Amino acid sequence: MPSSSKSDFSFSTLIIPQHYLRAILKVVSSSSVEVCGFLFGKENRVLKVRFIRNRLNSPVEFEMDPEEMLKALEEAEQENLEVVGIFHSHIACPPIPSGKDLEGMKRWPVIWLIVNEKGEYKAWILSEKNKISEVKIVVE
């Protein structure tokens, strides 16, 4: 599995190419269920986006398909990429972490990019002390 950042993750900025952010927003704008996937790259810089099927097929929560997750993680490892973050959408809600997101952030202590169908997006990180902090997003 590719390495992911440790729980003492100190990056305060997520750097994402504009075409990747646009691709995520485009899929989210036409989806009736939460969209999810991985942000792969190096440190805090996104070099690849990988959509993963939401196996819950739900408009209010997501769970990445385990087989697709494994395949994506193996591909990233072959490409020497790390898990920079996880992205998912909220439908008809602001892009802020929910209680369920907080639980996921404890399991995956990386940046979480949350977007909605209005084109709003924010990124978040969970500290070791379970404090959620907003992460600045730089679109290149």
Swiss-Prot record:
Quote the PTM field: The disulfide bridge probably stabilizes the PfJAMM1 homodimer at the optimal growth temperature of the hyperthermophile.
Result, substituting D101A:
Loss of catalytic activity
Point out the annotated site residues (description: Transition state stabilizer): S98
So which cofactors does this thing need?
Zn(2+)
Indicate how activity is controlled. Answer: Inhibited by EDTA in vitro.
Q: Which CDD domains match?
A: MPN_like
Tell me the Gene Ontology biological-process terms attached to this UniProt entry: proteolysis
Molecular functions per Gene Ontology: metalloexopeptidase activity; zinc ion binding
Q: Where is the active site?
A: E34 (proton donor/acceptor)
Q: Which SMART domains match?
A: JAB_MPN
Q: What is the effect of changing E34A?
A: Loss of catalytic activity
Binding positions for Zn(2+) per the UniProt entry: H88, H90, D101
Residues annotated as domain MPN: 13-133
- Quaternary structure note: Exists in two major states: monomer and homodimer. Both conformational states are catalytically active.
Record protein name field: Desampylase
